[in-house]
Amino acid sequence: MGTNKPVVIGIAGGSGSGKTSVTKAIFDHFKGHSILILEQDYYYKDQSHLPMEERLKTNYDHPLAFDNDLLIEHLQQLLAYKQVDKPVYDYTLHTRSEEIIPVEPKDVIILEGILILEDPRLCELMDIKLFVDTDADLRILRRMQRDIKERGRTMDSVIDQYVNVVRPMHNQFIEPSKKFADIIIPEGGQNHVAIDIMVTKIATILEQKVNL
């Protein structure tokens, strides 16, 4: 591992924007190197103290749904090259699982999540801040495909959630956080030019840190 602190790349954007595709493209390029992915989705607040009817009301697209205090604590530990135990969220029980995932520190940390740029404390820990900007129509189609196929949701429930929760939260919190990004990537994982530029930039930063 390097003698300097790791490089932190923040990748934000709305649900279905292609964040995961961009993250995977960057991760795959540096595969075999010292790199890890830390997803904000794993850091939803523990709700085990609440009855199920209350948990079902959780707005997963609101900043208050996330335990950013724990995420920041873990990120700071990884920056100090210390192992952390990443929590696991159980979407069927709508609370944190008892399972944990040990995460070893690496020289490159990709922090991914819909609202990572909304919290200035997280922004301060990032070396590069990206926002994946994708048309709303494409985002809802991707979300429908994912939720129906992978999570067993009905089309009506996905549309209802999008209209009443996802879209207003995107407009209120996610879209405004775009102004804090260093780079805005349109078209998500399909934008190979932007991804290649990012890979080159990250490689340059890593080289500079090694030579310090």
UniProtKB/Swiss-Prot annotation:
Keywords: ATP-binding, Cytoplasm, Kinase, Nucleotide-binding, Transferase. It catalyses: uridine + ATP = UMP + ADP + H(+); cytidine + ATP = CMP + ADP + H(+). GO terms for molecular function: ATP binding; cytidine kinase activity; uridine kinase activity. ATP binds at G13, G14, S15, G16, S17, G18, K19, T20. One of its GO terms (cellular component) is cytoplasm. Its EC number is 2.7.1.48. It is found in: Cytoplasm. Pathway: Pyrimidine metabolism; CTP biosynthesis via salvage pathway; CTP from cytidine: step 1/3; Pyrimidine metabolism; UMP biosynthesis via salvage pathway; UMP from uridine: step 1/1. One of its GO terms (biological process) is CTP salvage. Belongs to the uridine kinase family. NCBIfam families: PRK05480.1, udk. PANTHER family: URIDINE KINASE (PTHR10285). This is Uridine kinase. It comes from Bacillus thuringiensis (strain Al Hakam).
